[in-house]
């Protein structure tokens, strides 16, 4: 690897990690589980798919689409059933890859790709409005003006910095710069600590504490199948998008196998399920990331 490529990948990876952590915590809260489960899942899935997957430059982690799928299971049956579901869902993904079904993504029409990407962009944009609320009420007065000012300043950095220099990713400069500004001026803004209490150690290997019988299988199987289908679809469409952006071709079957193994590992170590994340992938590619 050339030094310039290594530098670009390191900076892009740092940028993506800053964006990935709060998102995975937020998705864990959506799924009504401990935020640590989101962090465990993000680390395990991102690491394994990066090392063994078939699409360099693509970012995977504990995704929001997976959180929405399994929230009802968590509410009704608890976290241990979620871990078993992640295990089974990973097994389905693994089988999908081993059967070489990933290449079917090449048959998806381009308009579907456009609809997928733009639909996710709208969802991501709409999701930002909740940050303009506090305790169910819209921000007003100084708090609102401060939020709007920081958002505008962040967008200006991302938009204008590439016109001055491309030595560093603009998203990384915006995150670090605005973070430092808020800290130095002691501005009254919300932090990750306000979203949830995050404390704990490293994950440990343990089987889900559930009765291993057909009744349990009947409970988790529908969620596992749905989780696998949603995860595979989002992953393969993101892989297709990455192919278009980089003008290279990935290996969808290999990515499916790696994603399945990653989800099974996450389930064994107490993490959430996950798949490719289009938002983080676009940030990574836009920051110059092309490698693993």
Protein language model annotation of sequence segments:
Residues 1-292:
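Transmembrane helical cores of multi-pass ion-transport proteins
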